Curated annotation (Swiss-Prot):
This is Nuclear export protein. Pfam families: Flu_NS2. One of its GO terms (cellular component) is virion component. Average number present in a viral particle is estimated to be 130-200 molecules. The keyword Transport applies. Keywords: Host nucleus, Host-virus interaction, Transport, Virion. Disulfide bonds: none annotated. A motif (Nuclear export signal) lies at residues 12-21, 85-94. The gene is NS. It comes from the Viruses. Mediates the nuclear export of encapsidated genomic RNAs (ribonucleoproteins, RNPs). Acts as an adapter between viral RNPs complexes and the nuclear export machinery of the cell. Possesses no intrinsic RNA-binding activity, but includes a C-terminal M1-binding domain. This domain is believed to allow recognition of RNPs bound to the protein M1. The keyword Translocase does not apply. It is found in: Virion; Host nucleus. Interacts with protein M1. May interact with host nucleoporin RAB/HRB and exportin XPO1/CRM1.
Amino acid sequence: MDSNTVSSFQDILMRMSKMQLGSSSEDLNGMITQFESLKLYRDSLGEAVMRIGDLHSLQNRNGKWREQLSQKFEEIRWLIEEVRHRLKITENSFEQITFMQALQLLLEVEQEIRTFSFQLI
C-alpha cells in the first residue's frame, strides 16, 4: 500500500467533510462513507495479496468475494460519475481541486483493486 495514497485518501476525505454544499450535504456524506469503505476494501485486498496463498483464506472468509469485488467496481464507477458531475457543476476552485484529486485517486484505486484481484484469481 502506497503511503502517498493513504495520505491522499485522508486529505481528500478531510477536505470533502469540510465542504458545505447546501442541500446535497447528505449526498456528500454518503460519498465520503463510500470512499472510506472503498479504501478499507482496497487495503484488505492488498494485505491478502501480500500474504502468499491467502486466496483460500479469503474464499473461506467470504465465499462470495467475486460478487463483492463486482459490487466494489460498481461503487467505484458510481463514485467516479458522481465526482465528475460535481466537478462540472461546482464553481468554487477549492471544491474543483478537491474533486479533481478525488477523481484521480479513484482511478488509481480502481487500478490497484484490479491488479490485486488479478493476483488473487
